[in-house]
């Protein structure tokens, strides 16, 4: 058994030419590329979706040693978008019609042993293909290329094709195997290794699953994602005194856990879980789908650790095994679904969709994080015969998990186990999600909200303060109401990050600004809605995000706007200068009472100041403060109650105006300094200061500064932010940042990038060499900044 990574040494041709499959390929301009690869890098926005739609080709020459005689040579592609035909030495060997699943090609019969061989791939990423997700309009780009890793395996003629383990929380397990080749007389050996290193060995026959019970298991859960390792060996017993021979072995990670969906919600290992999830597209700026494993894993980190989500939906297709691996390790539940978007095609299209379902299940079913299969094309109309087949195919291959399918209409046919509903009903008032009983045709089955939020109310990072706040409160309202409504298992917000799209969608610049993060995964204000729901275990876990910059000139008429704080602290203290104003606690009976940590509205900017500076008694100060805060809220329009208070306190309008100018402020008033303190366990653990900007600094953060070149090229994700002297984002800074590198990395995308909403980013790819690298960043009006990286090469 030999394994080789095959991600270097490829040649790319932007148009497919039959000469690519021939032994000699002269006259073609071929570009050396490394995998993962995209057929066309696109600009950040205003891209042309036709640019990545092309019929192109890849070629790789290799030597096949004579020692491979009598062996089986298997070539595996992690994913090729979207229609791939593989040739070896001129022979057409394999065709694959899904851009989101892996496939394996047996090269054995076509090889020239002891000689040079030529492998060629015909890659078709045109959207007129009669395969999912194509056939209708699509609200995302689908890109093209060999965008996941490639590997070569040399095996015996008899080998293990697949291993699947069912493992329940109680410790019961069943191990299924599938083999290829002559296996008469062969046996199986299965070894389960715990995280602590203890081992249990079981033996079995090929015709039956290996069953058993492992005592004292630690179930996989969101809080404790315990992973076990299973190694299965295919053994040919020795004869005539010869020892047994291991023909093949396969290792998978898995977890002991039990998933149950009922009318009351989701139960994991018998404990109810309220899903607080997000939808994720696997696309990135410039590169589309073609990013290495490290960035796939980084997205899982953002979702679980930064946003505090416990679930993710891989909209609208199966995603990278590296992403699923990270979800397994982090305890992040995954709802993965068959490729497609609102369209169901003809019988040939459906046949490919069924095959996609089978491949999705077989390739993802050992991941304990996967708890739900999407057996329906997102948003598609009813098709009873077709969706009976998808559900049957999935349950046949994996009887342990329920199925769902994202519906966009009420009371559609429910052939799945769970009714998943894209609920975009909220318009800013009233209930934020529809009543479960009015949507699902069968209230005895499970129910969840598969999408909500960003599509209904997109927000650009550079939108004004009020717009960004409305999006954040929109997310908070639906999150709250999905928790409050009995029988709703939870929700998946739309979506993690902004993404490139077709001309029929988005904001006219080929971007859907639906994300709680931008394309570079910089957080918007709405990200704080999710992040603030985390349960803090240390001061560093405390989130404190203030919605307002407290800049009156940014607001219509200079009238102060709403100010909300998104925090998981116990309370928030407000100071004006050095003077304490008031302390605010979450409203456990208000609009967001169902949330673990409701956002806090800062509605008192006067507080105790009147007692200190106006000499008022406490009761009078409370009434006057109420008048001033109401005037702030209502654009200087006193209510009848405020007028009555003024009369009872013998306050004239000029008296009120004087105090308003002094304690609230108007356009042109001396700018005040506000300090917000997050209080946890009785002490201030995090502070935000709002005051006029005195200096601008360019912040450069490399999220993964240690890179490993191998088995593919690696990539660093870099975030850029313009911040003030207090570390606050400057949302209207749009300066250009000049980027320059030293060392063995290269910039993906332009070397000069603008900040959008005060934020930006870039990617740094390894070049096949080890060493230290430096990223130099220069922006007008700020000091230059640098970031350092370490690049290692895997042997």
Functional labels for PLM-detected ranges:
Residues 175-178, 232-234, 563-567, 714-731, ...:
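Beta-strand-rich structural segments
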């Amino acid at each position: 058994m030999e394994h080789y990574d095959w991600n270097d040494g490829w040649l790319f041709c932007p148009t497919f030419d039959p000469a690519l499959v021939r032994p000699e390929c002269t006259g073609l301009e071929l570009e050396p590329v490394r995998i993962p690869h995209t057929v066309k890098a696109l600009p950040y926005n205003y891209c042309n979706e036709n640019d990545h739609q092309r019929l192109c080709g890849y070629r790789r020459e290799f030597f096949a040693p004579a020692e491979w005689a009598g062996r089986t040579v298997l070539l595996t592609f992690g994913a090729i978008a979207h229609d791939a035909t593989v040739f070896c030495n001129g022979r057409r060997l394999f065709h694959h019609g899904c851009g989101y699943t892996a496939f394996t090609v047996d090269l054995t019969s076509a090889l020239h042993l002891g000689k040079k061989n030529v492998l060629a791939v015909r890659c078709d990423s045109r959207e007129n293909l009669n395969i999912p997700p194509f056939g209708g309009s699509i609200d995302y780009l689908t890109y093209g290329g060999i965008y996941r890793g490639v590997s070569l395996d040399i095996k015996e003629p008899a080998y293990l094709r697949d291993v699947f383990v069912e493992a329940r929380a109680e410790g019961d397990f069943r191990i299924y195997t599938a083999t290829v080749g002559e296996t008469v007389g062969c046996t199986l050996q299965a070894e389960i290794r715990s995280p602590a290193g203890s081992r249990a060995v079981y033996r079995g026959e090929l015709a039956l699953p290996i069953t058993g019970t492992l005592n004292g298991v630690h179930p996989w859960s969101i809080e404790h994602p315990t992973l076990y390792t299973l190694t299965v060996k295919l053994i040919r017993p020795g004869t005539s005194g010869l020892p047994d021979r291991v023909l093949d072995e396969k290792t998978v990670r898995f977890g002991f856990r039990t998933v149950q969906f009922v009318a009351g919600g989701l139960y994991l290992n018998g404990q109810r879980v309220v899903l607080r999830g997000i939808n994720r597209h696997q696309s990135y700026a410039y590169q589309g789908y073609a990013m290495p494993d490290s960035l796939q894993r980084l997205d899982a980190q953002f979702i679980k650790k930064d946003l505090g989500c416990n679930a993710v939906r891989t909209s609208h297709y199966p995603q990278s095994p590296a992403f699923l691996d990270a979800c397994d390790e982090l305890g992040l539940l995954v709802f993965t679904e068959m490729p497609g978007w609102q369209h169901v095609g003809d019988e040939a299209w459906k046949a490919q969709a069924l095959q996609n379902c089978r491949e999705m299940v077989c390739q993802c079913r050992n991941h304990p994080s996967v708890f739900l299969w999407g057996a329906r094309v997102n948003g598609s109309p009813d098709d009873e015969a077709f969706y009976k087949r998808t559900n049957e195919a999935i349950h046949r291959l994996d009887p342990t998990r329920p199925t769902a399918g994202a519906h966009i209409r009420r009371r559609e046919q429910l052939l799945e186990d769970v009714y998943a509903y894209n609920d975009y009903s909220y318009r800013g008032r009233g209930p934020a999600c529809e009543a479960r009983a009015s949507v699902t045709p069968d209230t005895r089955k499970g129910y969840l909200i598969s999408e909500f939020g960003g599509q209904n109310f997109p927000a650009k990072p550079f939108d004004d303060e009020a717009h960004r706040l409305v999006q954040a409160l929109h997310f908070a309202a639906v999150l709250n109401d999905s928790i409050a409504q009995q029988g709703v298992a939870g929700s998946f917000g739309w979506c993690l990050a902004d993404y490139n799209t077709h001309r029929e969608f988005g904001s006219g610049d080929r971007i859907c600004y639906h994300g709680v993060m931008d394309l570079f995964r910089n957080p918007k204000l709405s990200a704080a809605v999710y992040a603030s729901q985390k349960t803090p275990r240390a001061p560093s876990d405390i989130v404190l995000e203030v919605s307002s910059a407290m800049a009156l000139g940014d607001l219509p008429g200079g009238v102060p706007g709403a100010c909300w704080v998104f925090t998981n602290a116990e309370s928030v203290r407000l100071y004006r200068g050095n003077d304490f104003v008031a302390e605010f606690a979450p409203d456990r009976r208000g609009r967001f009472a169902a949330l673990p940590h409701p956002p806090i509205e800062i509605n008192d900017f006067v507080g105790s100041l009147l007692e200190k500076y106006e000499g008022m008694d406490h009761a009078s100060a409370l009434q006057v403060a109420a008048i001033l805060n109401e005037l702030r809220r209502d654009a200087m329009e006193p209510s009848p109650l405020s007028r009555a208070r003024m009369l009872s306190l013998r306050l004239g309008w000029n008296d009120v105006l004087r105090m308003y100018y002094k304690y609230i402020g108007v356009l042109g008033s001396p700018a005040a300094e506000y300090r917000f303190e997050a209080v946890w366990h009785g002490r201030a653990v995090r502070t935000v200061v709002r005051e006029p900007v005195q200096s601008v600094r360019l912040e450069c953060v490399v999220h993964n500064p240690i890179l490993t070149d191998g088995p593919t090229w690696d990539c660093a994700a870099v975030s850029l932010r313009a911040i003030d002297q207090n570390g606050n984002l400057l949302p209207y800074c749009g300066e250009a940042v000049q980027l320059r590198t030293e060392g063995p990395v290269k910039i993906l995308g332009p070397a000069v990038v603008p900040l959008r909403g005060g934020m930006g980013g870039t990617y740094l790819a390894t070049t096949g060499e080890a060493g230290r690298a430096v990223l130099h960043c220069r922006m007008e009006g700020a000091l230059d900044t640098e970031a350092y990286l370490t690049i290692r090469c895997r042997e």
